[in-house]
Amino acid sequence: MSHELTLQEIDQFRSDFDNSRNQVVSRAAMRSGVLEASFNPAVTNRLNDVFSVEVETDNVTNQMQSGRCWLFATLNTLRHDFGKKYKAKNFTLSQAYNFFWDKIERANIFYDAIIDSADKPLDDRTVKAYMNFAGADGGQWAMAASLVKKYGVVPTNAMPESFNTNHTAGLSDALARKERKDALVLRKLVQEGKTEEVEKKRKEFLSEIYRMTAIAVGEPPKTFDLEYRDDEKKLHLDKNLTPVEFFNKYWDINFNDYVCLTNAPDHEYGKLYSLPFEDNVNGGIPITFLNVPIEYLKDAAIKQLKDGESVWFGNDVLKEMDRKTGYLDTELYKTDELFDVDTYMTKAERLATGEG
């Protein structure tokens, strides 16, 4: 079907728009923006910071202009456990440390995927998906758990934040461009049957990725001294720890005991779903989600909070979110009322159409 807009139709659109109501809301939207003009103040009456189940929290950490929310959330759950166990409120872990290893591991798994798919054309959907993920920042719980399990953790002072960890676009773009160029080289070598040269080049490329990342964010420490004061001001010192030793010594956690629950009503409940394209560590924990009804997910989260344990969660945070207040609410913006349209869809419909 091909429909060409006519001048008569445009004239009708103008006529339909020409009323006082549209002029009033247009002035408000143009002056304040669509979201401000449609903000629903009624949400403030029911969104407060008083909860029936409270878990003691520490100071908020700030991912700044980076896609590391998944990593911050995982490390926040770990530092909550540390603070609770060792009475050290506001103890923080370095996000920069695990961010470094994420870049190296992602490059490694990217090169493997490119080599394995070298027999497919560049416009193959699988190959294009790999190319799109090159240099990416975003992630899931299993990705952070894989990094912690393999590389451990360090306190913030052992590897502090830097400009390029707070603002990752520059490094991510540089890594993506390099990895895509490397992909062309590796594909050509595989197609020519030069197996030994493939492995040689792969190692060379990984060394270059390491160099780029180290230049941008610094090299991660091999060892460090753990030094902190607990809530009673008592000094604690544990010298010459490796990051893995630190994690194994101070945390009693088995990541395999945890599962990510999701609510995707456009897919069958009671099934385990995976995102193999987003796995970041070869031999790590694969990304999986157990799809359950929303009531089950809610009940599980409440039980975990009642047990005194923080809950990692991920959501489409840019939808119905106000940065100034921190509100997340499906009734936050009355954009349908502003535009006089009906965009309501069920959650299943939103997911199926790419809206969710």
PLM features per residue range, with description:
Residues F72, N76, H80-D81, L147, ...:
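Generic, well-ordered alpha-helical scaffold segments in large soluble proteins
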Residues S94-Y228, E232:
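Papain-like cysteine protease catalytic cores
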Residues S2-D58:
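N-terminal regions that are enriched for targeting/export leaders
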Residues M64, A73, N157-E161, N315:
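Glycine-rich, histidine-containing beta strand-loop boundary motifs that form or position
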Residues E199-Q304:
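Extended, H/D-rich, highly charged conserved domains that either
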Residues T61, Q140, P293, E355:
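Short, glycine/acidic-rich beta->alpha junctions
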Residues Y130-A134, T168, S172, R177-E179, ...:
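Active-site-adjacent substructure of cysteine-protease-like catalytic cores
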Residues L35-D124, Y130-G139, A145-S146:
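Long, well-ordered hydrophobic secondary-structure segments characteristic of membrane-embedded
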